[in-house]
Swiss-Prot record:
CDD domains assigned: Trp-synth_B (cd06446)
Protein name, per record: Tryptophan synthase beta chain
PROSITE patterns cross-referenced by the UniProt entry: TRP_SYNTHASE_BETA
Residues recorded as bearing N6-(pyridoxal phosphate)lysine in the entry: K87
Cofactor: pyridoxal 5'-phosphate
Catalytic activity: (1S,2R)-1-C-(indol-3-yl)glycerol 3-phosphate + L-serine = D-glyceraldehyde 3-phosphate + L-tryptophan + H2O
Species whose genome carries this gene: Escherichia fergusonii (strain ATCC 35469 / DSM 13698 / CCUG 18766 / IAM 14443 / JCM 21226 / LMG 7866 / NBRC 102419 / NCTC 12128 / CDC 0568-73)
One Pfam family linked to the record: PALP
Domain of life: Bacteria
């Protein structure tokens, strides 16, 4: 199929979907390309971002956790966005696209529940029906978000197949869409999947990096040495990285979930520890067995519990423009506690992975003068029960 935009990032990406979905993807690409050139669409999107979602979000300088070091650390506060995470940005854009295409229903998948909440709120706002697929395990561990979705009128459908987590929810959502695309838009929640989704999601998240660049120049008079973001599928990270890719003096650091430790096999770090394959409509690194079956990923944070990664991250890794590292559950938990105790901010466990790596950089080289920005992609209200249970089991509370 001929596309309007390049469906690949180097060798990664593409449109590996059943033929039945090709017209839906073509229609989506055409709608996106025309919307990007339409001042009225852009004005409507920007108005929602400003007056409904609460953009621009703050860039907060950490006051206490850098004490005794020469590191200056800022947090890009996507946790302050309406809905509680960066997810709200791009769902507003996709919901407007759905209306533009004449769709009346939204289908979505969710892991931590943040994309589900964002999809539900955008659907409620714009008068769209919404059904959300969620792994049964995630329904259990993210009950506050499940109730939020239902309060906003969404139907939440637990998925019991496979590992009953995000990858299984993705499969069910795609299956639904293949039979309902004439009336429904599939609101994919990350910068992965078949073209044009990775490009659409990046463009509807790129204001994170654009705002960060303007804010850090105003505050510090220079660009940061590095911007750091957690990577599951990779939407918050690509939103932060996009405006810095051509700023070659700025390091781009993506943090994958190391789970119980890479050596245990219980992690979600396919970029550094997976093999290239085809899954979820794209060619990308993924966790797979010797015979090519998709392996179950694992992370303390439901939103990073994904066995593959967006194709642009795979490309940035392959050309050496971005560095990808991993952080274990325990390291993320320590960072979570540190930010709560010393800055009065409760971060999402996903974002805590990025913070943990920044703290590691700071502690490993306390004398080094460095200016770092962490994308605090979401707030941790949804995670307090998970953290409570872990700390209680350890006898720490």
């Amino acid at each position: 199929m001929t596309t309007l935009l390049n469906p690949y990032f180097g060798e990664f990406g593409g449109m590996y979907v059943p033929q039945i979905l090709m017209p839906a993807l073509r229609q989506l690409e055409e709608a996106f390309v025309s919307a990007q050139k339409d001042p009225e669409f852009q004005a409507q999107f920007n108005d929602l971002l400003k007056n409904y979602a609460g953009r621009p979000t703050a860039l907060t300088k950490c006051q206490n956790i850098t004490a005794g070091t020469n590191t200056t650390l800022y947090l890009k506060r996507e946790d302050l966005l309406h809905g509680g995470a960066h997810k709200t940005n791009q769902v507003l854009g996709q919901a407007l696209l759905a209306k533009r295409m004449g769709k009346t229903e939204i289908i979505a998948e969710t892991g931590a529940g943040q994309h589900g909440v964002a999809s539900a709120l955008a659907s409620a706002l714009l008068g769209l029906k919404c059904r959300i697929y969620m792994g049964a395990k995630d329904v259990e561990r993210q009950s506050p978000n499940v109730f939020r979705m239902r309060l906003m009128g969404a139907e939440v459908i637990p998925v019991h197949s496979g590992s009953a987590t995000l990858k299984d929810a993705c499969n069910e959502a795609l299956r639904d869409w293949s039979g309902s695309y004439e009336t429904a838009h599939y609101m994919l929640g990350t910068a992965a999947g078949p073209h044009p989704y990775p490009t659409i999601v990046r463009e509807f998240q790129r204001m994170i990096g654009e705002e960060t660049k303007a804010q850090i120049l105003e505050r510090e008079g220079r660009l940061p040495d590095a911007v750091i973001a957690c990577v599951g599928g990779g939407s918050n990270a690509i939103g932060m990285f996009a405006d810095f890719i051509n700023e070659t003096d700025v390091g781009l650091i993506g943090v994958e979930p190391g789970g119980h430790g890479i050596e245990t096999g219980e992690h979600g770090a396919p970029l550094k520890h997976g093999r290239v394959g085809i899954y979820f409509g794209m060619k990308a690194p993924m966790m797979q067995t010797e015979d090519g079956q998709i392996e179950e990923s694992y992370s303390i944070s439901a939103g990073l519990d994904f066995p593959s990664v967006g194709p642009q991250h795979a490309y940035l890794n392959s050309i050496g423009r971005a560095d990808y590292v991993s952080i274990t559950d325990d390291e993320a938990l320590e960072a979570f506690k540190t930010l709560c105790l010393h800055e009065g901010i409760i971060p999402a466990l996903e974002s805590s992975h990025a913070l943990a790596h920044a703290l590691k950089m700071m502690r490993e080289n306390p004398e080094k003068e460095q200016l770092l920005v962490v994308n605090l992609s979401g707030r941790g209200d949804k995670d307090i029960f998970t953290v409570h249970d872990i700390l209680k089991a350890r006898g720490e509370i």
